[in-house]
Curated annotation (Swiss-Prot):
Cell attachment site, short sequence motif: residues: 164-166
Name this protein carries in UniProt: Secreted protein B
Family note: Belongs to the Sct family.
UniProt lineage: Eukaryota, Amoebozoa, Evosea, Eumycetozoa, Dictyostelia
Residues carrying a glycan: 129
Compartments it resides in: Secreted
Segment forming the signal sequence: 1-19
Keyword Secreted among UniProt keywords: yes
Top-level lineage group: Eukaryota
Main location as per UniProt: secreted
Length: 184
């Protein structure tokens, strides 16, 4: 612990001697944008999973102050896993997706959204552990062969929307993914 503290102090001294200055407004703008992105995502997710957000619920979810970073990171890793056929990246991405779902559930609970909360929580727990991820991957392979509908195409849609900055669309696609998993 002392080593880390000394390292942080040295880093601070070195950065101040070189005139490196972190603009606190820039950091807060980034956090604010991430919260806005999360809010748009949460509203889109509700639409994708077919939860009706009326009046005050919509306003409450729109005012969420959670960060979109877990979902953003998850889509980046899943995209990398799909492009490079990297099981490790895909698994890490699914794990981050599950962690993001935990934040989403907390937002919905805080706003009084009761529909599907337990199901979304169960899915978030499932994709944050190794066994659940393996089951999801096996199920995905079977689903592609039997139904010609794959979660992969929904994930690609979410990734594409996220890349374009369409966080509502990204949320809709993610809501559809979770909706499909809930029906399994």
């Amino acid at each position: 612990m002392r080593f880390i503290l000394v390292l942080v102090l040295i880093l601070g001294l070195v950065s101040s001697s070189f005139g490196i200055n972190v603009d606190k407004n820039e950091v807060s703008q980034t956090e604010l944008q991430s919260a806005r992105d999360f809010s748009s995502f949460a509203i889109g997710f509700a639409e994708g999973i077919e939860i009706s957000l009326t009046g005050n619920l919509h306003k409450c979810v729109a005012a969420a102050e959670s960060s979109f970073s877990e979902f953003s990171n998850s889509f980046h890793l899943i995209d990398s896993g799909l492009k490079h056929k990297s099981l490790g990246d895909a698994k890490s991405g699914l794990r981050d997706f599950g962690i993001g779902l935990v934040d989403l559930v907390k937002t919905y609970q805080r706003c009084g959204v009761g529909k599907f909360i337990s199901e979304i929580s169960a899915i978030s727990k499932e994709v944050t552990n190794e066994t659940g991820i393996i089951k999801l991957i096996i199920h995905e392979v079977i689903d592609i062969f039997h139904n010609s509908h794959s979660l992969t195409s929904d994930f690609k849609s979410a990734i594409s929307d996220c890349g374009r900055g369409d966080y509502t669309g990204c949320g809709v696609a993610s809501g559809k993914i979770v909706g499909i998993l809930m029906r399994q």
